[in-house]
């Protein structure tokens, strides 16, 4: 009977050791899982913080770019509302707004043309000639006054007559110079007004909202880099419109 009891005790002790070993393995596995979950959550939180920082930087740059674009926009667009732009009755921004300004009473604000370099040089030359014509007349008046004081009765009459004649000649010269200056100015103004009335102009709107004023006077001063695809398309439409109207006028004149 003694050996049987020893076998049972040994079997019970072996079973308890196996259970304890499996329990310890479960505890270790749960601890590893907890550590893995904590590390994963920490890395995820760090990644979220980094993405939020990048998003804030991106929003700041977008805000700056938006403010710069608002500063570049013309003042007329600052006051317009979105519902006005979305209205179907209003004309679109890309449409061509063109005005051929000829001799017509409908023009309320005529074009103001700056004088050219030739006109400025001509006016400066006229002013110089008028100032030079005034200086010798004043130089002639001074000796006549001296001769009046030093002359006798007969000589004074002769000097007075010569003085009056010279004064009248000087006045005639002044009047003729003024008339010539007025005539030249009138011709220049009439020519400038005629040129302004007969000059063809066009207003082009680019895709960025910039309005370009095109005319024969400033055709060499236009920056070609500002003319984008929208502006070129508008100019092509203008050319087609002008060709159509010219052909229509020719047909009307032949009839």
Curated annotation (Swiss-Prot):
Cellular compartments per GO CC: chromosome, centromeric region; nucleus
Compositional bias of kind Polar residues: 124-135
Pfam families in the record: Nbl1_Borealin_N
Family matches, as InterPro entries: Borealin_N, Cell_div_borealin
Main localization of the protein described in the UniProt heading: nucleus
Compartment(s) of residence: Nucleus; Chromosome, Centromere
Top-rank taxon: Eukaryota
Keyword Cell division found: yes
One GO BP: cell division
Ranges where the record places region Disordered: 1-24, 107-156
Keywords for this protein: Cell cycle, Cell division, Centromere, Chromosome, Mitosis, Nucleus
Quaternary structure (record): Component of the CPC complex.
Role according to the record: Component of the chromosomal passenger complex (CPC), a complex that acts as a key regulator of mitosis. The CPC complex has essential functions at the centromere in ensuring correct chromosome alignment and segregation and is required for chromatin-induced microtubule stabilization and spindle assembly.
Family per similarity comment: Belongs to the borealin family.
Protein name per UniProt: Borealin-2
UniProt organism field: Danio rerio
Lineage, highest ranks first: Eukaryota, Metazoa, Chordata, Craniata, Vertebrata
Designated gene of the protein: cdca9
